[in-house]
Amino acid sequence: MYDVIIIGAGVVGSAVANELMRYDRKVAVLEKGLDVCEGTSKANSGIVHAGFDATPGSLKAKLNVEGNRIMESLSKELDFSFRRNGSLVLCFREDEKERLKLLYEKGIKNGVPGLQLLSGEEARRLEPNLSKTVVAALYAPTGGIVCPFGLTIALAENAYVNGAEFHFGTEVIGMDKLLDSYLVHTTKGDWESRIVVNAAGVYADKLHNMVSKKKMTLVARKGEYCLYDKQAGGFVSKTIFQLPTEYGKGILITPTIHGNLLIGPTAEDIQDKEGLYTTGRGLEEVMKKAALSVDMLPPLRQIITSFAGLRAHEAKDDFIIEEVEDAKGFIDVAGIESPGLTCAPAIGSFVAELVNKKAPAIKKENYISRRIGIKSMASASLEEQKNLISKDPAYANVICRCEMVTEGEILDAIHRPLGARTLDGIKRRTRAGSGRCQAGFCLPKTMEILSREWKEDVSSIVKSGEGSYYLGGYNKQKREGGSKDEI
């Protein structure tokens, strides 16, 4: 019997787990993917929003400002990358200035510090590449950027070392309400828990509807992005927004925490909750709308990849974080779209309070609050590099040339708490395969290391999910029950 089961190991589920483990209780996280950060958390803008867009008085507004406030201290405690680069919301016409002013006033009501309304000239002094058509801008100095993978993994690792269990490849397929608990049916057996926290992203409505007569509907809203090489990383220093619409914050241009340039996302409501495909139409929209914000975008040849992500949109445009009225002990954390990444640490605390009111627990005296992340050789000083190599020669063996990732870093990613078992798991922890060649050079070597360290045949190594094998031929036929003659 568990005290709490959390369904979903994205940034929200991991944040909830980390906060719950401050107390003496038995917690398990069930995740249908093979790693943390496999859903919405793996494909978003990586923005730490200031909090001026959310409706004053809403849960989204409260958690946005609080999440932004604590992100910097959390990044130091859990050793993930974060930077306050500031953000600008652009206005292109005189008749739009009133909307910009309303956005400013919302931010003031929400308690966002340092907001300023700028003229077009003042905005261009901050960002010289802005379009000459910009007539005004809202500047938010508290806006920031973060690695969504790094944040999620840090929260999950810290929850794990404090006692939380993580069970991957474990999809929830049903639930029964017992007298004082829930029986959660999964593809890997049944689990019983007094409290269930539903942090399942775009599938949160499906889980809610298993236990409640009052049905929930979430829409999968797809966003497509283009990612530029680090050559273009200095094109802007701040996150550049256009005025938000009913579908979201619009097409942005932003540096990433690792030095790339990111543009996107689109906003398209789709039926397929696994619809992570990009389209020519969508990417054309990204380029066309992003081009409005600047004089000229960097050349297309500097784009190294494109991708799409899904966020869970709820019709009332606010987060749903509450105990379900007709399913006591079942807590929804649903409709977590932008600014969900920013809010995640605050959501973790908010849900922990709900759980503590429901089932009080004793605070741990030995809670581990500090984590040491993977040391990056690319960003280390010469002295630090020499020290790492002297302790382990694997740090002298460069595996990924684009990002200068060494074997030592990959080994750390595999053997640390909640170690990587997939190629994407290595990529998200070390950036091996994230560079210009997109793993063209390092893929075989990374597969060999994973195979060696996990003592698995190289043919069984997957990119991310079940069945995403790279290798075929004889080994694939053998794995699927065929024979050598069938090649």
Where are the model-predicted features located?
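Glycine-rich FAD pyrophosphate-binding loop
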Residues: R22-A43
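N-terminal Rossmann-like FAD-binding beta1-loop-alpha1 element of flavoenzymes
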Residues: Y2-V29
